[in-house]
């Protein structure tokens, strides 16, 4: 599948960034635009099909690869975040991340939103919420992965992080208000997720 192929390519790029940064350096300017496009387009799809999925979307069959592993947007998001982690951990590539910090944080917070599935599960069992949200939890999710990446960025770029995070939070709060005032059922039912994710990002 297209998602599976993108995931495999991102995993390969991550290995190259970590192990042969000198060889990758001349190619980074060509690699980053399609990776960024994948991150942004996948965010729209993830929010629509996972975060705000309706009951009808629950019937979609899972796609598996040749190894029997489920190939989904979650796996693609994990691969994107691992690639960004690799850039942050490699001194040669950190300036590339720093340059687009505010926009990157905006999309990370999008991925931090509670999904309908999580909301239903946690409403029925509050103890499960406490367990899943614990930093030592064995339940790894896009929400937790997003928090991990945001923490890594703030630790690496302390000074820039404050301004970028403030801009990100304000942007999400503004868009949440616009959603709530949109007059649509989807907007009214989902705008709170933006606000919750923004508050979560503040820690």
Language model features by range: what are they?
Residues 8-12:
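WD40 beta-propeller repeat blades
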Residues 2-4, 43:
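Alpha-solenoid helical repeat architecture
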Residues 22-29, 33, 37-203:
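Alpha-helical repeat/alpha-solenoid scaffolds of the HEAT/ARM/MIF4G superfamily
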């Amino acid at each position: 599948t297209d998602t599976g192929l993108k995931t495999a390519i991102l995993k390969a790029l991550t290995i190259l960034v970590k192990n042969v940064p000198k060889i990758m350096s001349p190619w980074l300017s060509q690699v980053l635009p399609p990776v960024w496009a994948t991150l942004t387009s996948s965010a729209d799809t993830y929010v629509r099909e996972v975060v705000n999925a309706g009951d009808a979307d629950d019937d979609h069959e899972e796609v598996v690869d040749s190894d029997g592993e489920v190939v989904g947007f979650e796996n693609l998001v994990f691969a994107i975040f691992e690639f960004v982690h690799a850039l942050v951990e490699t001194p040669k590539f950190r300036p590339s991340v720093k340059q687009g910090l505010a926009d990157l944080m905006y999309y990370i917070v999008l991925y931090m939103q509670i999904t309908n599935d999580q909301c239903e599960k946690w409403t029925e069992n509050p103890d499960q919420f406490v367990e899943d949200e614990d930093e030592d939890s064995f339940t790894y999710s896009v929400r937790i992965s997003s928090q991990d990446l945001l923490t890594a960025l703030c630790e690496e770029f302390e000074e820039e992080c404050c301004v970028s995070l403030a801009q990100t939070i304000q942007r999400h709060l503004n868009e949440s208000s616009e959603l709530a005032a949109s007059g649509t059922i989807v907007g009214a039912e989902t705008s709170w997720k933006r606000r919750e994710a923004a508050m979560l990002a503040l820690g």
